[in-house]
């Protein structure tokens, strides 16, 4: 747009040449979510039948599930810029993407695990109070990078399996057939839990 206006008006420069992409990263262009991975879609349906949560929480989980089978894990190559179809994310940018793309724009795309620990948009909860949409971290004090991990609680399946959606470099607890990247998993190493304040029922 800026280049076009330069030509039309005869200017050498015209504002921010990256203005349009800078604005569009905050625009949620596709509110409808499609989960293409069959295992993920089946698990998501069972989770919704077996658990209660605010509609906004399910939107977060659905957004994350839409990346299962397409997003690979990488801290170095993570594309934490809000693009619609990222190829690489790490645990925190995946969690942030899921929240932000579902409409909760107070969670920045470039979040790291430290962001989720310190954010005043979330508050601490105990593990026995978990509801779908809550987040879990390995540690309250762990640093960023490989020292910590974050994911989104999704509820339990009918057989009692506790399900998290997260993005990881490797996992032996995947429920969606992939051992790397975005997945539903029976992950058990989260010890610190937080909830978006507006979802807290008190």
Give residue ranges: language-model regions.
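Short, well-ordered loop/turn sites that connect or cap secondary structure elements
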Residues: 129-130
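Short, basic/aromatic beta-hairpin or loop at an interaction surface
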Residues: 97-117, 155
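Aromatic- and glycine-rich peptidoglycan recognition patches
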Residues: 6, 11, 15-29, 35-41, ...
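Short linear capping/connector segments at secondary-structure termini
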Residues: 76-82, 112-119
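Structural motif
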Residues: 133-134
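N-terminal capping segments
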Residues: 3, 24-105, 141, 146, ...
């Amino acid at each position: 747009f800026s280049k076009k206006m330069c030509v039309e008006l005869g200017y050498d420069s015209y504002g921010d040449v990256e203005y349009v992409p800078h604005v569009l990263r905050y625009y949620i262009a596709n509110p409808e979510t499609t989960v293409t991975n069959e295992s993920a879609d089946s698990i998501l349906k069972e989770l919704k039948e077996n658990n209660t949560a605010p509609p906004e929480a399910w939107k977060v989980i659905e957004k994350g599930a839409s990346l299962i089978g397409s997003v690979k894990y990488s801290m170095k190559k993570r594309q934490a810029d809000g693009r619609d179809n990222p190829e690489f994310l790490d645990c925190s940018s995946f969690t942030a993407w899921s929240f932000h793309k579902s409409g909760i724009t107070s969670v920045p795309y470039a979040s790291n695990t430290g962001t989720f620990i310190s954010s005043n948009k979330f508050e601490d909860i105990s593990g026995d109070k978990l509801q779908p949409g809550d987040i879990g971290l390995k540690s309250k004090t762990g640093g960023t990078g490989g020292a910590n991990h974050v994911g989104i609680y999704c509820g339990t399946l009918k057989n009692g399996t506790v399900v998290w959606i997260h993005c990881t470099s490797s996992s032996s607890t995947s429920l969606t057939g992939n051992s790397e990247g975005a997945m539903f998993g029976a992950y058990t190493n989260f010890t610190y839990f937080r909830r978006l304040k507006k979802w807290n029922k008190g």
